């Protein structure tokens, strides 16, 4: 006889997940207020909360402060954000960051290693696994304390199978990241594109949880984007969606690291900007930079450009050569033009921008000015900087695991 219908355990898990999500969005609440929101009886919610308290998933936070009233005071419950911990790994072209956080995203451990592209991906990932285990050991954390490992990489990702299909600027071929790391660490791994992971973090921890349709744009070191439709990340054909950095702006233009020609990234990424600056670099064209770098164009690197952008108000950027200023302004205009075209088609509720280039207030303001020039509706009210941008190195990886946990979806054991 074939059993049909929904199991009682499934219903209970679904209700527990609803409770966790409400607490994540609203903070500590009373059992009665939770019951009113999810449509269950206070008695049913009390039973569910008792189960979760026994499992250390939630905890009581004391009595609610309210006006004097007869009867028992409401007792608040909240998520136990220190119930377990999460390892977040962000693999970029130059460096890879390793961060251990609690479920809320508060940091316990931070470390950084060089992203080695001079060796086979498997060897680098094995080295990475050793570093992760070292960081856990130094913090006296056991694998049983870890909910999972969230991995973020640029480029095209097959999340379901844990495969990096093409990590632009890092690996040209497919890399089975989840399989390799789970074998080394014996801990569940979730892999996602870095911009999509950040979008997931915004929906969990940031202003994204208040909007239904959102576009995310990242600038620095490359260009990336993600789309949220009806509170869900949009996944396109072949795991490839919303690649604004590979919007073609110049037919027969420069070859991009994605393999095509004329992509936006070939003109506005930090690598492209460095190449363009090197082309015009001379004592006559760039006298200030020439002096800063002692006549050595090899010192013009992505790291140098990043330091200019991040140290706004200090150093070279305050007295930049006019020729280099024109290159940066041209890049900002291109970014704004493509962004307006994309937003005109998608018409989102809001747009959230982040990345090292948008960290610079002058660059962000000029970007908004160009957007408004092309369409007066695209002001800083519609296009805003992420409040999570200072957590960009780890919050995406944390969100991958935390959102799965809050949904009470079982993370497959390796």
Predicted feature locations:
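ATP-binding/phosphotransfer module of carbohydrate and carboxylate kinases, centering on a glycine-rich
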Residues: 1-61, 67-71, 76-137, 141-144, ...
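Phosphate-binding/catalytic loop of phosphoryl-transfer enzymes
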Residues: 89, 147-152, 156-275, 402-408, ...
């Amino acid at each position: 006889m074939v059993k049909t219908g929904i199991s009682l355990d499934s219903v209970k898990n679904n209700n527990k997940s609803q409770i966790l999500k409400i607490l994540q969005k609203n903070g500590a609440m009373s059992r009665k207020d939770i019951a009113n929101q999810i449509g269950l009886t206070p008695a049913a919610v009390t039973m569910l909360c008792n189960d979760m308290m026994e499992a250390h998933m939630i905890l009581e936070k004391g009595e609610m402060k309210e006006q004097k009233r007869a009867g028992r005071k409401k007792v608040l419950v909240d998520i136990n954000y220190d119930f377990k911990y999460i390892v977040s790994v962000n693999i970029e072209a130059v460096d890879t960051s390793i961060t251990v956080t609690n479920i809320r995203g508060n940091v316990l451990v931070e470390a950084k290693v060089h992203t080695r592209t001079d060796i086979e991906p498997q060897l680098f990932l094995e080295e990475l696994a050793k570093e992760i285990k070292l960081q856990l050991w130094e913090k006296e954390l056991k694998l049983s304390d870890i909910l999972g490992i969230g991995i973020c990489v640029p480029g095209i990702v097959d999340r379901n199978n844990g495969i990096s299909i093409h990590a632009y600027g890092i690996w040209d071929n497919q890399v089975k990241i989840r399989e390799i790391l789970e074998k080394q660490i014996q801990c569940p791994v979730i892999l996602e594109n870095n911009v999509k992971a950040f979008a997931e973090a915004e929906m969990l921890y940031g202003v994204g949880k208040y909007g239904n349709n959102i576009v995310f744009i990242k600038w620095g070191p490359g260009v990336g984007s993600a789309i949220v439709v009806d509170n869900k990340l949009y996944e396109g054909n072949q795991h490839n969606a919303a690649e604004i950095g590979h919007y073609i702006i110049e037919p027969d233009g420069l070859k991009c690291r994605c393999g095509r020609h004329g992509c936006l990234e070939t003109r506005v990424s930090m690598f492209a900007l460095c190449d363009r600056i090197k082309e015009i670099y001379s004592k006559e064209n760039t006298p200030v930079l020439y002096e800063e770098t002692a006549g050595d164009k090899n010192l013009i690197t992505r790291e140098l450009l990043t330091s200019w952008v991040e140290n706004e108000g200090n150093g070279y950027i305050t007295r930049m050569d006019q020729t280099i200023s024109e290159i940066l302004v041209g890049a900002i205009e291109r970014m704004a033009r493509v962004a307006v075209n994309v937003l005109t088609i998608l018409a989102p509720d809001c747009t959230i921008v982040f990345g090292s280039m948008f960290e610079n207030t002058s660059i962000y303001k000029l970007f908004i000015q160009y957007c408004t020039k092309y369409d007066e509706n695209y002001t800083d009210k519609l296009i805003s900087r992420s409040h999570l941008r200072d957590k960009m190195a780890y919050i995406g990886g944390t969100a991958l695991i935390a959102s799965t946990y809050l949904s009470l979806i079982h993370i497959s054991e390796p």
